[in-house]
Amino acid sequence: MIVQEPVLQLCRAVSEAGGRALLVGGWVRDYLRGCSSNDYDLEVYHLEPDVLRHLLETQGTVNPVGAAYTVYKVRLRYQRRSLVADVSLPRRESKIGRGHRGFVVTGDPFMTFEEAARRRDFTINAILFDPLTQEVIDPFNGRADLDNHLIRLVDPATFVEDSLRVLRAMQFAARLEFTIDPQTMAHCREIDLHDLPAERIWGEVEKWLLRSARPSIGLLAARELGILEQLWPELQSADLNALGHSLDLAFEETAPLDYPRRVTVMIAILCRNFTLGIPAVERFLDRLSLHTIERYDVRRQILSLVTHRNLPFTWSERAVTDGDYRRLALEVEPGLLARVESATCPDQRMIVDHFLDRVRQLGVEITPPPPLLLGRHLLQLGHPPGPRIGEITRAVYQLQLDDRVHNLDDAIAAARSFVQ
């Protein structure tokens, strides 16, 4: 993997000023695994904060995101291209309270590499890389753990201070398809997770479900780490092997979907068979703070998908009209329902495919048919404003769903019959 020129240019500027810029975290981990990454995270040593800030401003647009401990997002410029890198001083953390927020963090450019790496969660994330010399600095043997596909904590004394690391262990196990070290697993089980806010939990769940080719690994890890017991008791009674298989299938099937719909399908599969029904699903969504994403009502769709689970199979056993399919699209996206049911019941794929073919033929895979008759049409015909307009348009729309109204002329004629 080649470090991009804007990053090298920044590292040279730091070196010329008397400092040293090292890549840390995910970029280094991916580089050593032979994977590409644009996740540039640089730690700068031996430069005072004011000097670093001034230097960064010569390289690009600087946005401070952690002024207390000197963290910057820098949009680096090079010729006509640009990229964003996170640049920070090494950080010294002091524990002052419970949970993942109970820290005072200060930048310290004169820490040793080992001191700086010790605050990181896992050895595979505690490796430093010098882009100018190609030197790999590995104070905690993270390379060996990478080779052994092992997730191992850096320092038992500090690891337990940040409860979010338990969920990070889960999502890294899934994304990297690594095994969690038994001692690390034991430390994770001792950590209370109830201090974690919903937004931070969702951040790790999103990485687990949407960035892992095998989410099943994370699901089984969540059980062993104590996450199910503490945060998601609804999943404790589930057949995790079957559920994990469904998630793995859905990860592939949702690849063509946009982000909000991918979230919707993956979470709906998790919630589909909760024994306590919709109230349990609502509580689960609350714990993830899932509502609307990119103006798409994820929460409503998930609840509707769970409500209509098994519907393609029950409909295969009776006569179903085109109107039934169109009305279904008023309540849930039939295309998403097909994906959820296909991943959950892969042995019934032919039934789901027939269901999906039907909704596509009718043009209601995503949305119901738009109404032909609108209130403005009735006003143009001289109908007085009032609630009766809504009653008429709704009645005509029902006829449209049943194929008894095919165009605007039909709709207006039907409306006149309701007025008389």
Ranges and model annotations:
Residues 1-420:
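Catalytic cores of the polymerase beta-like nucleotidyltransferase superfamily
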